[in-house]
Curated annotation (Swiss-Prot):
Residues involved in substrate binding: T62, D137, E192, K222, D226
Keyword Hydrolase recorded: yes
UniProt-listed Enzyme Commission number(s): 3.13.2.1
Catalytic activities: S-adenosyl-L-homocysteine + H2O = L-homocysteine + adenosine
Subcellular location: Cytoplasm
Keyword Membrane among record annotations: no
Free-text comment on the cofactor: Binds 1 NAD(+) per subunit.
Name recorded for this polypeptide: Adenosylhomocysteinase
GO cellular component: cytosol
Gene Ontology annotations of biological process type: L-homocysteine biosynthetic process; one-carbon metabolic process; S-adenosylmethionine cycle
UniProt binding sites for NAD(+): 193-195, 227, 256-261, 279, 314, 335-337, 383
Length: 469
């Protein structure tokens, strides 16, 4: 693959093109660890099921995502890509994608203005009104299209409730994109993460969803693998790279015990930490207790713990008033999608507090009494801001789900009226099968009479949609 883009190709913006050769080496290594994606590439390349697809991708621009992008292209798609987080881009991966002649607009450490400019570029298709497919992580590309349509319809800009919405408001006010025409051509969106899925269900409930969506997050091969096993790996990686603090013997609080929280708690306990869970859901709280964790409220333990990790996908989980009660040198980080789980704005407004950068995405906050907190990635995803995210094998599951979901929506538009769907079970099982050989797994095969007895086909699917794995 080239280390420089074609001479006439300028439709990109990355930090440093000279990193492309390094990025290509890491992409090649990742391909070996991503058997699901590579198998799909081999199976579908001749048929070109995504020929004619114009995919706007908004998902962390990492080495693993580069393998996803090149898989989509290999299946016939045209792609324009941005990262879905200002800190998550791996600049060498972005450079390698640009060098391959694929439009990409992403670099680590974007401002909010730059971030939303990049998203606008990914939705801008020369010669077309826009994309006809969206691949989203967190829902920002989908949100921008919906806000644009609303603005064109009503002439009313969204309220600037926070700094980010103020940036979106300014973008919509100046943008020349025809959001209404764009939305009419979009066949659907496939959404990667819990937070984006919440947005989709809210829009559908309110009657404002403009096109069909597949909830990739709740595919079993995504939520039970990426969310749990991926976070189990990458949380510790992020904390270690950021702080080099020994985790063994420390007390850690994990806010939330969903799939992400379960993976985080397991990894911290595996390092020897005493882990305490906070939960709102009685079922998840009972699970945590049965798994051997103390379950308490944040108020009960906020002045006793050494490490705090938010995993909920909700807002205002750790407030400035909570941080004021924490121990000296407590570490505070988030692994939920957005930056509103930790009250960073409130922390900055404490009179006399002083923020100091230790290194990129690691800051100390010194209170007037001399107490210092260590905050990772400014409250954004610490596993991507302070480390490199989930390992390739886990992401192969999620990105195989994404690829099959894109094919499903693009090739079968009549089967998906506007609604929010989950990935069909047979595709979920297909993704799992594609990863078994790499782990040396040998499946038992049902005999016909056994399959008949439990009411399934010999080749599956084996579980009903409501089954909880």
């Amino acid at each position: 693959m080239p280390s420089q883009p074609p001479a006439d190709f300028t439709d990109f913006k990355v930090a440093d093109l000279s990193l492309a050769a390094f990025g290509r080496k890491e992409i090649t290594l990742a391909e070996h660890e991503m058997p699901g994606l590579m198998s799909i590439r081999e199976e579908y390349a001749a048929a070109q099921p995504l020929a004619g697809a114009r995919i706007t991708g908004s998902l962390h621009m990492t080495v693993q995502t580069a393998v996803l992008i090149e898989t989509l292209v290999a299946l016939g798609a045209d792609v324009r890509w941005v990262s879905c987080n200002i800190y998550s881009t791996q600049d060498h991966a972005a450079a390698a994608i640009a060098a391959a002649g694929i439009p990409v607009f992403a670099w680590k450490g974007e401002t909010l203005e730059e971030y939303w400019w990049c998203t606008e570029q990914a939705l801008t298709w020369p010669g077309h009104t826009g994309p006809n497919m969206i691949l989203d992580d967190g829902g920002d590309a989908t949100l921008l299209v919906h806000k644009g349509v609303e603005y064109r319809k009503t002439g009313i800009l969204p309220e600037a409730e926070n700094e980010e919405l103020a940036v979106v408001r300014a973008l919509l006010d100046r943008s020349g994109l025809d959001w209404t025409a764009m939305s009419s051509e979009i066949r659907g969106v496939t959404e990667e993460t819990t937070t984006g899925v919440h947005r989709l269900y809210e829009m559908h409930r309110d009657g404002t969803l403009l096109f069909p969506a597949i909830n990739v997050n709740d595919a079993v091969t995504k939520s039970k693998f990426d969310n749990k096993y991926g976070c189990r790996h990458s949380l510790i990686d992020g904390i270690n790279r950021a702080t080099d603090v020994l985790i063994g013997g420390k007390t850690a609080v994990v806010c939330g015990y969903g799939d992400v929280g379960k993976g985080c708690a397991e990894s911290l306990r595996g390092q020897g930490a005493r882990v305490i869970i906070t939960e709102i859901d009685p079922i998840c709280a009972l699970q945590a207790a049965m798994d051997g964790y103390q379950v308490a409220t944040l108020d009960e333990v906020v002045d006793k713990a050494d490490i705090f990790v938010t995993t909920t996908g909700n807002k205002d989980i750790i407030m400035a008033s909570d941080m004021a009660k924490m121990k000296h040198q407590a570490i505070v980080g988030n692994i939920g999608h957005f930056d509103n789980e930790i009250d960073m704005a409130g922390l900055a407004q404490i009179p006399g507090i002083v923020k100091d950068e230790v290194k990129p995405q690691v800051h100390t906050w010194k209170f007037p009494d001399g107490k210092v907190l260590i905050v990772l990635s400014e409250g954004r995803l610490l596993n991507l801001g302070n480390a490199t995210g989930h390992p390739s094998f886990v992401m192969s599951n999620s990105f195989a789900d994404q690829t099959l979901a894109q094919i499903e929506l693009f090739t079968k538009p009549d089967e998906y009226p506007t609604d929010v769907y989950v990935l069909p079970k047979h595709l979920d099982e297909k993704v799992a099968r594609l990863h078994l050989d790499a782990l040396g797994v040998k499946l038992t095969t049902l005999r016909p009479e056994q399959a008949s007895y439990i009411g399934v086909e010999v080749d599956g699917p084996y579980k009903p949609d409501h089954y909880r794995y």
